């Protein structure tokens, strides 16, 4: 009886696996960032743009934590698609952001992708 149960559990675990859909993260603290390997090729230009533009004002750690927890680390407000859009508009209006509408749109799409992947 025990052998049958053990065999059944082994087969079940062998056939069924849990897929981790979350975006991988590298580093800790101020060096924390999304792993470029876990980002689809179509999103890589937006990711590269985010790596250059967003770190002018804050570390990527802030963005990673917001995506992982669903909470903006500074304000404590929900970090969802609506908030991402609002942050995009806010960044567009900042005089030193050096970002245009297309760049903001690309980064908003990327952040929404991260939110979707993290929710899986």
Spans of model-derived segments:
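Sec/Tat signal peptide C-region and signal peptidase I cleavage site
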Residues: 15-21
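The canonical Cys-X-X-Cys-His
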Residues: 51-61, 107-111
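Gly/Gly-Pro-rich "capping" loops immediately C-terminal to redox-active cysteine motifs
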Residues: 47, 59-95
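C-terminal capping alpha-helices of c-type cytochrome domains
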Residues: 97-120
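Electrostatic cytochrome c docking/interface patches
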Residues: 22-49
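Soluble non-cytosolic domains of exported or imported proteins
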Residues: 40, 44, 48, 78, ...
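Sec-dependent N-terminal signal peptides
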Residues: 4-13
């Amino acid at each position: 009886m025990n052998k049958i149960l053990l065999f059944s559990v082994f087969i079940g675990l062998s056939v069924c696996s849990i897929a981790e859909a979350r975006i991988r993260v590298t580093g800790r603290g101020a060096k924390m960032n999304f792993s470029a390997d876990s980002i689809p090729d179509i999103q890589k230009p937006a990711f590269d743009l985010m790596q250059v533009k967003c770190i002018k004002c804050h570390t990527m750690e802030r963005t990673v934590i917001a995506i992982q927890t669903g909470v903006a680390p500074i304000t404590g407000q929900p970090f969802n698609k609506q908030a991402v859009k609002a942050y995009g508009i806010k960044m567009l209006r900042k005089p030193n952001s050096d970002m245009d509408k297309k760049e903001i749109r690309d980064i908003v799409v990327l952040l929404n992708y991260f939110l979707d992947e993290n929710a899986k």
